[in-house]
Amino acid sequence: CTQQYEYHYDPKSDDEITLKAKANHRDSSQAARVGTNVHNALEHWRKPDADGKTGKLTFDRLMEYYEKENSISEVDFQFYEDGERMLTRWFDRRGRQPVRIIDTERGFGTHRSPYKLSNGTPVFGFIDAILEHRDGTIELLDYKTQRADITQAEADNSIQAGIYLAVAREWWPEKKIKFSFDLLRYGVVSTTWSDEKIDSFKDWLKTQYEWISKIEKGNPTIGDGCKWCAFADLCPKAQELMQKGAWDLLDPTMGEDLDEMLTELATIKASKQMLDRRQRSIDAHLKNNVFD
């Protein structure tokens, strides 16, 4: 969303500056804080030393890092427990697997000094963990503590995956590479792209960069992240949805009551049938009375 980008990186009004500061306040970012604490604990736990070796990867050691992170960036008890449960589940399922860790939290460029792909497109970010498997495959991991799951189709078409794979292909041109969303609440969703797909993505990304570079004013785009956007109170699109009573349609379904979801689904289906009938009626009227 170019509007959110403008609000965040180039706030102009007092309201924009205030909302940006509010988003960073502890009471507004408990879920984000526990996510960061979980990420940091995994990063330090897996971090190799100068010789490329890691310490003993035990659960107790992982929890020591988690507790240390919470002493630096504290969260309420319920969020602390949520992070603890995620790490426990993650360790039982994936933490015991032997794997060579190349690096953790490896950066490529910054907002002010981005990494430039071979076609000149600037990108920046951090790769949570880089692993090397026995067959030589390089795996790029991105930890996710979000409540929404990620489908295989979403991973196969992820812009984040594309950027990371494009960078990794330039770092390891002869290696097999894959990207994985490591969803701490669910499991791992991996995607492998051919060199042709990576090259095509880089070409597309360059067109997006050139388009964004020409934008003089942000344009709001409605999407899944709107419910958590700090600037919804200023966003004209969000305000329009609120006034029409459609804002709640952006709510995710994860964790909702099953009966409520079934009731909502029945309502949606009934409404869809009525709208379909209305559409057919209008189409017939226009065909018989206007276009004949």
How would you label these PLM feature ranges?
Residues 1-31:
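C-terminal, charged and often intrinsically disordered regions of DNA end-processing helicases
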Residues 3-9, 36-47, 262-269:
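Short, hydrophobic/amphipathic alpha-helical patches that form generic packing surfaces
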Residues 9-21, 40, 141-145, 180-189, ...:
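Short acidic (Asp/Glu) and glycine-rich catalytic loops that position anionic groups and cofactors
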Residues 11, 43-50, 91-92, 131, ...:
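Hydrophobic/aromatic-lined pockets within catalytic cores
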Residues 26-28, 33, 37-114:
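A non-catalytic, helix-rich entry segment at domain boundaries
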Residues 37-40, 159-167:
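Short amphipathic alpha-helical face segments that pack within enzyme cores
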Residues 70, 119, 151-156, 165-270, ...:
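Metal-dependent nuclease catalytic regions and adjoining charged, substrate-binding loops involved
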Residues 103-161:
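Non-catalytic protein-protein interaction segments used by genome-maintenance enzymes to assemble
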